Every structure is written in structure tokens, then in C-alpha cells.
């Protein structure tokens, strides 16, 4: 019997990286998984793998930069399954823009995708969870939500905001809904590769106890903990999964 048997879990940004690994793990643990992303081919591939391994999943094509994102994901989920038990706000973007040159649009794009879309979707699912008397929301922040990294001014700002949002939501939604966050360090993902990969993050890697990049599966295992009764006395927390940065 899986830890998430019969539960419905929305995982945004789950066509690659940490979200995809979490979708696979949640499905193995019995969840009905709602995969979201912008690319239908990649989304279908994730759903196909889940089904091939005996799991259940659907995908929703939705762009977290669009104001219709939350409503689209919520409506499609309710249409398919009629409820929501777990939401993992994982969709995000990483801009390289620096303080001196970033434009208003670049800055606001990061804020909207990384924070606002999570808030809007959480607002949609919260009443469903409250009516059931239980629910879990997991916000993906970042290690840079604790300390800045040079050159990522919008990303750093958005992830600090995600830390604050997680704490605020936990206060307002307790005791019915558990709200916690994950602060990944440098994780081996397509997003990290898009901004230069290991070379760009080598200074951070050198400051970790483990001296390596993390794997998406290592984020997924923490997400599973936060999505189940294993974390029944954990609320409003931001768990750093960073290999031991600056310990």
C-alpha cells in the first residue's frame, strides 16, 4: 500500500527536473497525479511513463506566466478527479538579469511565475482541502531564498518572497492544511543547465559538505515526506535540501 493511495496530487512544472521526479514518485506511492507544463509532448511522456508503471495521471497544458493558469489547472483537475489533496507549487523560471540592467518586465515575469502563480493556484485548491478537513501544500523556494546569489536579482527576490508566502499561508490555513516549503540548492536540472550548469554554480558546490549537485529524486523524497502524515507535526517550515551549504 502506497503512502499516497487514492490521493490527488497537482505538481506544477512537472514535465522535467524536480517536478517530473516528484510526479513519478508520487504515482509510485499511489497518487493520482496531475502533471502541468507548457509542452504537450513532454507532458504526455511523463503521463505515459506513469501509466506504464501502473500509476494514474493526467496532464494539463498551462503556462504559469498566464493569468488563466490557476483556473485552468484547477478546473481540469476537478473535472478529472473531483478533489485535490496535495499541491506542489514547483513551476518556476530563472532569469540571469542583473540589478543594473534588469527591466521591469523581466523582474515582474520572475515574480509572477515563481510566486504569484503559486498563490493563485493555492487559493483555488484551499477551499477544497478545507472542506475535506485535510490537505498539503508544498512550495518550492530555493537556497537563494535564504541568502543571495550574485547576478540573479529577480530570482533571488522571488524566492525570498516564496519563503514569506509559505509562512503566511501556513499561519492562515492551519490547522486544516499543512503548508511547507523546500529550498533546493544546486540541483541537476534543465533549468540549471540553461544558465550555465555546474560551472556557474561551482562556487556554491564548493561550499557544500557533499561537494556535488543534487538530483531531482532527492527533492522528490522530501516532497513525499511533506505530502503525507509522516510530516504531521511539521508546518510552516522551509526545508533546505542543498548538500550542506555553508555548514
What is each PLM-predicted segment?
Residues 142:
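Residue(s) in the substrate-gating loop at a strand-loop-helix junction
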Residues 8, 15-17, 39:
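Conserved glycine-rich cofactor-binding loop
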Residues 119, 134, 212-241, 246:
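C-terminal substrate-recognition "lid" of short-chain dehydrogenase/reductases
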Residues 127, 170-175, 232:
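Alpha-helical segment proximal to the catalytic Tyr-Lys
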Residues 122, 158, 166:
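Active-site helix of classical SDR
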Residues 88, 174-178, 234-236:
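Short, small/polar-rich loop/turn modules that mediate ligand/substrate recognition or access, typified
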Amino acid at each position: 500500500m502506497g503512502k499516497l493511495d487514492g490521493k490527488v496530487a497537482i505538481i506544477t512544472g512537472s514535465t522535467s527536473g524536480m517536478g517530473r521526479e516528484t510526479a513519478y514518485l508520487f504515482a509510485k506511492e499511489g497518487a493520482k497525479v496531475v502533471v502541468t507544463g507548457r509542452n504537450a509532448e513532454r507532458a504526455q511522456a511523463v503521463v505515459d511513463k506513469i501509466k506504464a508503471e501502473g500509476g494514474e495521471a493526467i496532464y494539463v497544458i498551462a503556462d504559469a506566466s498566464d493569468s488563466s493558469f490557476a483556473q485552468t489547472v484547477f478546473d481540469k483537475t476537478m473535472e478529472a478527479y473531483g478533489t485535490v489533496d496535495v499541491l506542489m507549487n514547483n513551476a518556476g523560471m530563472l532569469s540571469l538579469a542583473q540589478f543594473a540592467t534588469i527591466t521591469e518586465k523581466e523582474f515582474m515575469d520572475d515574480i509572477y511565475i515563481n510566486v504569484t502563480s503559486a498563490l493563485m493556484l493555492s487559493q483555488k485548491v484551499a477551499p477544497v482541502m478545507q472542506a475535506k478537513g485535510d490537505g498539503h501544500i508544498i512550495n518550492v523556494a530555493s537556497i537563494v531564498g535564504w541568502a543571495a546569489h550574485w547576478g540573479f536579482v529577480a530570482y533571488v527576490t522571488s524566492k525570498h518572497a516564496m519563503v514569506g508566502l509559505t509562512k503566511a499561508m501556513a499561519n492562515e490555513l492551519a490547522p486544516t492544511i499543512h503548508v511547507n516549503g523546500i529550498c533546493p540548492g544546486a540541483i541537476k536540472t534543465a533549468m540549471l543547465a540553461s544558465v550555465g550548469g555546474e560551472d556557474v554554480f561551482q562556487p556554491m558546490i564548493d561550499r557544500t559538505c557533499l561537494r556535488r549537485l543534487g538530483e531531482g529524486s532527492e527533492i522528490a523524497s522530501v516532497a513525499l515526506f511533506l505530502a503525507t502524515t509522516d510530516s504531521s507535526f511539521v508546518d510552516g517550515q522551509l526545508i533546505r535540501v542543498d548538500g550542506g551549504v555553508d555548514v
